[in-house]
Regions:
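Short, charged, surface-exposed secondary-structure boundary motifs
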Residues: 33-34, 59-60, 176
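A short, glycine/Asx- and small/polar-enriched loop/turn
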Residues: 64-67
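Short acidic loop-to-helix transition motifs that present clustered carboxylates
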Residues: 56, 172-175
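A short, structured active-site edge motif that brings together acidic residues
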Residues: 49-58
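C-terminal edge-of-domain segments
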Residues: 69-74
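Acidic/glycine-enriched edge-of-secondary-structure segments
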Residues: 1-5
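Conserved beta/loop motifs at nucleotide-recognition and modification sites
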Residues: 79
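RNA substrate-binding interface of SAM-dependent RNA methyltransferases
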Residues: 8-25, 29-30, 35-46, 82-173
Length: 176
């Protein structure tokens, strides 16, 4: 995943026809340049999310010159389903048996900012606990596909698609 940060980078990315999948724009931000970018993105069918200044600050790779008005996500499509995520390839994290929503959320956020292409969560969570995990992730699920389901099935699908499986665990007894 690559991020384009600020009006200049996002505009250049659009002009160069990069594979922008999502645009995050600061709610209430207005300028002629920004309007032009948003029109171009909309015309190309690129999903646009309006976020708070805090959202933009958290998601931005560079705040050295202040919080940018706009960010663009290039390459990674957060709307992919599990099969599409596997087909797209890349690095997919699997959290198997994680029990605490906050820990799951931190892992989702870490995967997102480290450049992973998707996250699979195999955990027994209620809807309330899933919402808590998404909140703890700083709502990173908006920017990376997060799949909730059977981890073993996901591993089998990934292996069948040629993925190399690397496992890190501390108490497991099952070899995948």
């Amino acid at each position: 995943m690559m991020q384009r940060c600020g009006i200049t980078e996002v505009s250049q990315s659009l002009e160069e026809n990069e594979d922008i999948r999502l645009v995050l724009v600061k709610r209430g931000a207005e300028s002629e340049q920004l309007a032009k970018i948003l029109t171009m993105a909309s015309d190309r069918g690129i999903r646009i999310i309006k976020g708070s200044e805090n959202d933009i600050w958290r998601m931005s790779r560079d705040n050295s010159e202040g919080v940018p008005e706009i960010l663009a996500l290039v390459g990674r499509d957060p709307t992919l389903d599990l099969d599409e995520s596997i087909e797209a390839g890349g690095l997919i994290w699997l959290l198997a048996g994680a029990a605490y929503p906050v820990n799951i959320g931190f892992c989702i956020r870490t995967a997102e900012v480290s450049g992973a292409d998707a996250v699979i969560v195999d955990a027994e969570l209620s809807n309330t606990e899933r919402k808590a995990a998404k909140r703890a992730s700083m709502k990173a699920h908006r920017f990376i596909p997060v799949h909730w389901g059977d981890g073993l099935q996901a591993v089998k699908k990934a292996k069948d698609s040629g993925f190399r499986i690397i496992s890190v665990e501390d108490t497991g007894t099952l070899s995948l």
